[in-house]
Amino acid sequence: RDLHLSLRRQRQMCIRDSSSTDVGSLLLDGFGDGVWLCSDFSNDINTKLSFGILQATRTRISKTEYISCPSCGRTLFDLQKVTSEIRSRTNHLKGVKIGIMGCIVNGPGEMADADYGYVGTGVGQISLYKGYEVVERNIPADTAVEALIDLIKANGDWVESN
């Protein structure tokens, strides 16, 4: 049951917002399992938006998801740089959710539904999580991204990118 939505003459951000709220709420209520979006933008933009809505409503999982905190004074590593590196190395892992958190204070709670977690625990120290459980502590920050990838591989969630 596809939902068809035709949006014309709107800015791209407005189309993203209106289609997400209009179609997303219907999908969450069980009134469909697909999206057919038509707009004045390219098919690529329409397709990305449609799959984004399906992913957000858990109707169809088609990409890796990331949870990341906004960073604060407790963050003791370059969160933006590490997040970018993790995304570039793992963005092909369809259906995997990875939390990247700056500190131990709120990080584990904010990423509670992640499959894997990368959490700063001190100066130059990272802890890795599988689900809500800590599986490795006090990993040096310079090797922690590779350790995260090794953890994903060890749990059978790694596939090689094309």
Annotate the PLM regions:
Residues 43, 72-76, 104-110, 114:
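Conserved structured catalytic cores and adjacent interaction surfaces
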Residues 29-43, 120-134:
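Glycine-rich phosphate-binding active-site loops on the catalytic face of alpha/beta enzymes
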Residues 16-25, 106-114:
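Catalytic cores of alpha/beta
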Residues 44-67, 71-89:
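Glycine- and Gly-Pro-enriched alpha-helical subdomains that act as flexible
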Residues 82-112:
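Hydrophobic alpha-helical bundle architecture
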Residues 2-11, 15:
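Single conserved hydrophobic/aromatic residue that forms the stacking wall/gate
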Residues 123-129, 134-157:
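Beta-strand/loop-dominated core regions that host nucleotide or nucleotide-derived cofactor-binding catalytic loops
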Residues 26, 69, 103, 111, ...:
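Conserved, mostly hydrophobic/aromatic
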